[in-house]
Curated annotation (Swiss-Prot):
Its EC number is 3.6.1.9. Belongs to the Maf family. YhdE subfamily. It is found in: Cytoplasm. SUPFAM superfamilies: ITPase-like. Signal peptide: none annotated. This is dTTP/UTP pyrophosphatase. Nucleoside triphosphate pyrophosphatase that hydrolyzes dTTP and UTP. May have a dual role in cell division arrest and in preventing the incorporation of modified nucleotides into cellular nucleic acids.
Amino acid sequence: MKNIILASASERRQELLKRILEDFQIIVSDFDESSIPFKDNISSYVMNLAEGKARSVSKKIMDQDNNLVIGCDTLVAFNNKILGKPKDKKDAFEMLQALSGNEHEVYSGLAILDVKSNKIITDFVCTKVKFSKLTSLQIEKYVNTGDPMDKAGAYGIQGKAGVFVENINGCYYNVVGLPLNKLNSMLMEMGVNL
């Protein structure tokens, strides 16, 4: 069995991976996301970011042959504009105000790299999420919890912001940060059966 390495500091990704895999390592990627400019295609962009994270970690462990590195990146898009992590409370408020009453997309790019062979596969998942109409007071109260500050799109579906979600079309785990079904099929493609 290959050693699985998750190239992520995200606690949410680690928790999700623990649901399907008992034994894996975490090595945080030091990949500079700004080194890949966003051109136009969000799905290609998130796959490139995921690959960059996986390759960054693989360079740290090149002397260890039996490793598969999982890279992942998740972005929120609204009107073909990327909503990253908010810079401050005002930014978080504005993001949530824009999402209020509207549908947006959550994209996750996945990359799995076999360190020994340098074989890499990439893929992405897109989930559509519709928010209810939110009041300014609801948004302000949520922003003041601090919860939105480390999350793309300024919300976490698995937390207090779950009540904002009117409906979801696609993979719930993608919105949390790690699309488990897609990851499982990619791991199988790389010879890992969970």
